[in-house]
């Protein structure tokens, strides 16, 4: 019960952490993520930890859960995802102090555990690619999705030496990873769902044939009510 309450509160906090935008006036690019693409999730995890985790936590996720779900060895997790002596069973937090965040950004950067469930993958994908130069802002950039965002364009260095398509794929991988973080069980649920539907399909056929067999006797008078 407490876990459900915490999840709902975190989801509400994520929603309130972002400014409201007019969806009708904004075109969101399709992320086209695939949570079954393990290579994409692995790259997304690496990029998130290198470019995003300095400010944003994903407190509902643990390092060893990522290792288990994404088929990563403990050594790879330690090398690419853990930078401050964290333990595998710890949740993924940020080292940024709240006081510093409030001073530098005007508020504490939100935990992104549930951002994909709150905003959707298309929103994340478009937002991360939506920064443009604006000299009137503190960080020299603005964002077409979230106007007056207090976040700098942290992925600008990721563009260096890459084509637009390659950069878009990196952003897609980060988005894919955040989609996984929002609901890790989706990895099992989506694959299991296919088998459940197949089972229900076979069960429907067998039930229909059984119904025909029973009602055949009724139809041809083998079963008749007594007078």
Predicted regions and their residues:
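Bacterial N-terminal signal peptides that target proteins for export
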Residues: 1-11
